[in-house]
Regions:
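Low-complexity, intrinsically disordered/propeptide-like segments
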Residues: 11-16, 53
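Bacterial N-terminal signal peptides
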Residues: 2-13
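Detector for the c-type heme attachment site
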Residues: 148-155
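Extracytoplasmic c-type cytochrome modules immediately beyond a signal peptide or single-pass transmembrane anchor
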Residues: 19-144, 156-196
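Long, low-complexity, intrinsically disordered N-terminal extensions of eukaryotic proteins, enriched
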Residues: 6, 17-20
Length: 196
């Protein structure tokens, strides 16, 4: 089983993972390759959708599409790849995107490393949960200028976007970001058949 998580404003970071667990086990290497591919493909699909909708109808239309279609893309992607997908962020918009304890620790670490200018483009480790081994992979997502219209300082968000946010996400926590902040992460959890 794979859990993939995406956040809006996707950015493919190419920095090598200096703090990632390194291994030569072929099973782990295959899982890591899969996780990277999943992250890139899923992130690229959602990013393309958002940019296309921004060009067609502006940020309000992109937000409407994102709130409805991005989750569908994720579910469809899961069905095709055989994985379970969701989004996580410390400051989430959709309550479905609350991180699990592992993801929360890593997102907090990403925030700290980002402030220290030491954030890598990915993180992975093998963990044991309920007696099973998993590869946990996370790719931080950094706020880009295009993200600010929906995720930036609340007072600068356009009125039509604010209205949609209030209607669809009354408990929205995903505002007041600045360009360069960690918005969330794409996270992939892959079951490993043998114990590590």
């Amino acid at each position: 089983m794979v859990v993939v998580t995406i956040a809006l404003c996707l950015l493919n970071l190419a920095a090598p993972p200096p703090f990632a667990e390194q291994t030569k086990d072929p099973e782990i290497e295959r899982a890591l390759t899969d996780a990277r591919q999943i992250s890139d493909e899923l992130g690229g699909s959602v990013r393309s959708l958002l940019l296309r909708e921004i060009e067609k109808g502006g940020f309000a239309d992109a937000l409407r599409i994102c709130s409805e279609v991005a989750q569908e893309i994720t579910l469809r992607f899961n069905e095709q790849k055989g994985h379970h997908t969701r989004r996580v962020s410390l400051r989430y918009r959709n309550p479905k995107n609350v991180p699990d304890p592992f993801e929360q620790r890593k997102l907090e670490e990403f925030d700290r490393l980002n402030r220290e200018r030491k954030l890598a483009g990915e993180y992975f480790e093998v963990v044991t949960e309920e007696g099973h081994s998993y590869l946990r992979y996370m790719k931080p997502l950094i706020v880009q200028p295009v993200c600010i219209a929906c995720h930036g300082p609340r007072e600068n968000i356009p009125a039509e976007v604010k209205l949609i946010l209030q209607q669809k996400y009354p408990d929205d926590r995903a505002t007041d970001f600045l360009v360069g902040d960690v918005r969330g992460a794409i996270t992939v959890k892959i079951y490993l058949p043998k114990s590590f």
